[in-house]
């Protein structure tokens, strides 16, 4: 499914409670200085659990990154709809849990947010 970045910008409002998009120069692209979750600038293609300034990753996310998870659309869409289920399946660890408690209800929103992130959050 092809995402719509404009719809993704609107849907990203749901993410701003916990996430920001702040580029390497410190310019805020989206969000309101939230620190609960990692900065999503550079998330496209990034190994899971490796955003340098964020220290709050759970063990399940770190394990997924160690097992090779790099964020692409397919994995992002699955993860944001049910983080704990995704991490259990990806890592093969029945005890893995996602620290992200929010679940995005609509798959279309997930595709749209990914399209938005591809537009504004990719490192040049």
Curated annotation (Swiss-Prot):
Q: What are its GO biological-process terms?
A: photosynthesis
Look up the signal peptide feature and give its range: none
Q: Does the keyword Metal-binding apply?
A: yes
Specify the superkingdom. Bacteria
* Subcellular location as annotated: Periplasm
Chain positions recorded as heme c binding sites: 15, 18-19, 100
Q: Name one GO cellular component term.
A: periplasmic space
Q: Which SUPFAM superfamilies match?
A: Cytochrome c
Q: Which GO terms describe its molecular function?
A: electron transfer activity; heme binding; metal ion binding
Output the PTM entry. Answer: Binds 1 heme c group covalently per subunit.
Write down which residues bear the modification named Pyrrolidone carboxylic acid: 1
Gene3D superfamilies per record:
Cytochrome c-like domain
PANTHER family on file: CYTOCHROME C
The task this protein performs is described as:
Cytochrome c2 is found mainly in purple, non-sulfur, photosynthetic bacteria where it functions as the electron donor to the oxidized bacteriochlorophyll in the photophosphorylation pathway. However, it may also have a role in the respiratory chain and is found in some non-photosynthetic bacteria.
Give the family this protein belongs to, as stated in its UniProt record. Answer: Belongs to the cytochrome c family.
* Protein's recorded name: Cytochrome c2
- In which organism is this protein found? Cereibacter sphaeroides (Rhodobacter sphaeroides)
